[in-house]
């Protein structure tokens, strides 16, 4: 069993998938609407998990995880904003256990590789279909 954080959980599909596989899931989203949708997804599927409203790591002080998963948002209305994703990556080492992993799904054009390199000292690309990439960085 891994202790997993689903950052920007939305309606909880990834959280439910992880919980169904026996992982201890904490799901967070800045949106109260999304957090409630995630709670309902877990409840309706008889799955356990902790769901919190949190602006990135704000509700998770002192918490550490084996894995952090996210498809980080980069839009604020119609503008591109890297604020949340920047904090997600830069502060990940403080919230990962030793050998913990940060796994991101992202549009291929987003500038995450450089940030992952700086924050965690490296990364690998697990999947790349030219439109989306899945990155994994290990602490």
Predicted regions and their residues:
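A short glycine-rich, Lys/Arg-flanked "PGG" loop and its adjoining helix->strand segment in the class I
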Residues: 86-98
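Conserved class I S-adenosyl-L-methionine
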Residues: 108-119
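Conserved SAM/SAH cofactor-binding pocket of Class I
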Residues: 1-64, 70
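Core SAM-dependent methyltransferase catalytic element
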Residues: 121, 128-139
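Short beta->alpha hinge that forms the Motif I/post-I loop of the SAM-binding pocket
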Residues: 29-33, 84, 107
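Short conserved AdoMet
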Residues: 20, 97, 121
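A short SAM/SAH-binding and catalytic strip from SAM-dependent methyltransferases
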Residues: 69-79
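Conserved beta-strand signature within the Rossmann-like core of class I S-adenosyl-L-methionine
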Residues: 99-105
């Amino acid at each position: 069993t891994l202790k997993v954080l689903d950052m920007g959980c939305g309606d909880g599909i990834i959280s439910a998938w992880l919980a169904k596989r026996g992982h201890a899931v904490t799901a967070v989203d800045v949106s109260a609407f999304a957090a409630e949708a995630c709670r309902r997804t877990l409840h309706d599927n008889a799955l356990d998990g902790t769901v919190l409203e949190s602006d990135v790591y704000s509700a998770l002080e002192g918490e550490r995880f084996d894995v952090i998963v996210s498809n980080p948002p980069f839009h604020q209305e119609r503008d591109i904003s890297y604020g949340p994703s920047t904090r997600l990556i830069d502060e990940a080492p403080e919230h990962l256990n030793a050998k913990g992993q940060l796994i991101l799904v992202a549009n291929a054009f987003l500038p995450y590789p450089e940030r992952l390199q700086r924050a965690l000292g490296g990364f690998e690309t697990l999947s790349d279909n030219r439109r989306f990439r899945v990155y994994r960085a290990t602490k």
